[in-house]
Amino acid sequence: MLKFAEFPYVRPDIEAIVAKLGGLTADLKAADTAEKALDAIRGYRDVLIDYMSIRSIATTRYNINTRDPYYLEENKFFNKFGPVVDKAMVEFGEAILACNFIPEIKAEFGDIFITNIQFKAKSMTADVIELMQEENALNAKYQEFNATAQIPFDGKILTVPDINVLMASDDREIRKAAYQALSDFYVKNGEFYDSVYDALVKNRTEQAKRMGLKNYTELGYIRRNRNCFTPADVDVFRKQIAEDIVPAIMKAKQMHLERIGQPAGKIKIYDNDFYFADGNPKTFESADDMMAAAVEVFRELSPETRDYINLMEEGKYYDAPSREGKKVGAYCTGIPAHKAPFVFLNYAGSAADVTTTFHEFGHGFNVFFGRENPNTVLNNSTLDIAEIHSMTMEFMTEGGLHKFFKSEEDVAKQKLSHLEHCLTFLAYGTMVDHFQHIVYDNPELTPAQRNEEWRKLENIYRPFMDFDNIEYYETGRTWQRQQHLFSAPFYYIDYVLAQTIAFQFWAIGTEDFEKSFRMYVDLTKKGGRYTFVDLVRQTGLRVPFEEGSLKFIAEKVMAELNK
């Protein structure tokens, strides 16, 4: 078994890949039997496995060190030629939809495969390849700038993950100064962020126009495989957030203020992630120590998680520590040719980093279950489902928190702060998504007008927040820090929807953990075989678009916070 560092990498021959896909498309069109059609799809699947794997290896190695000149060029290569391969895949998908053997195809690959192919076929045309290449280059520009960001603080130069730790310091003055330092950085570089985002909005809007669509909102939903809900459903969900969740958060924040000895009213932005008067729970400073504890938790949780973490350890399928030049953020990817998940972290020693670790390893748990089935690459979970795997794992691993925190008091603190954070996130995440709808429904907005729209949304979704005249926050620029707005439009609502499902697993687990965990494992094993709505209903949980579905969550969480 090869370790991730040993995976071979050779730049792929894009012309050969496109030619292979073209040949398979011709074979599919000419197929006069179901078996010939299925053979063509199997061939397509195998090309996909190889291409996705080599691209994932290159991208991950680049993200680990964005200063590596070799993988910097490889990342540029995929940004340029990825859309060319995508177009060949779309053409193959169109041939599937025109095929006479749809029942036989569904029998082998599942109904959802055809549903997703229908979305893929509508996701691009030859007219937008050049625009997609430009879009990728703009995203890379944003990511590279963030990865190399240097923030002056108290005579030192810090990275973004480093400043994040200080923003939750026990010392209020340090927290405030850290928020001010981050504000200074973003204000100083505001023109850069505005110009990149403005270019992205114009680019994506032009893509939608060239494809004959009303706006990029419509195209964004297609590209996110929204196979079971619409903007109208999301609008119903938003109203529930405003009516049921925001009032609950406001009550939670009053309790929060009381805990930290601050007067009732709005909470200062630099107190929002400081949950206890005597300090947030303290965990390991070292990423190696953190990972050793995480391995123990997974080995003890269940036979499935034990086998999973043993694979991850043996292959070193993760990179945990934060360092200069590393891409900001965390994610999980799959490398199907090696049957390997890979988890990318930026551990800097905060309690929140522990949660992020379990979140990303939750994604990997799903990849682990699908690793032996080659058809998984054809039916990857849509992101709303994928985020259930990760957000629920945050709760499922709480029984092992004593391995990260020295006292039972700190374990209790971590559980409470995580619960409050997740509740608050429902409103914040919805605000991010609402902002995207406004931006892409009104692409003519200027950067200043976008900031005004964000500030208006703050009043709807975070009326409890006091920005204390810190310029970056007061002027509606906070959205610039949200990477998904730049690199993954219309992704963010998937986190929020998944959080409502994770809360339901948590609620069941408070009464019967084993039942909740087995339900979670069953859902995770199903991967992308069903739509989000169908999977949630099959699991016996409430779909968040249904009116009244969020009231139960608000009541359950508040009851726990009141204990």
Question: Where are each of the predicted segments found?
Answer:
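Post-HExxH zinc-binding segment in Zn-dependent metallohydrolases
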Residues: 243, 381-410, 417-420, 424, ...
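A well-structured
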Residues: 1-280, 293
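C-terminal, non-catalytic "cap/extension" segments appended to globular domains
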Residues: 114-118, 228, 357, 365, ...
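Active-site-adjacent bridging/hinge elements
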Residues: 113-115, 218-223, 265-271, 329-340, ...
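Active-site-adjacent "gating/activation" loops or surface patches in catalytic cores
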Residues: 161-173, 283-358, 363-367, 471
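Inter-helical turn/loop segments and adjacent helix faces that build the functional surface
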Residues: 231-232, 255, 259, 301-304, ...
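Glycine- and acidic
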Residues: 123-124, 180-189, 229-235, 272-283, ...
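Long, well-ordered alpha-helical segments
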Residues: 197-208, 213-214, 218, 252-256, ...
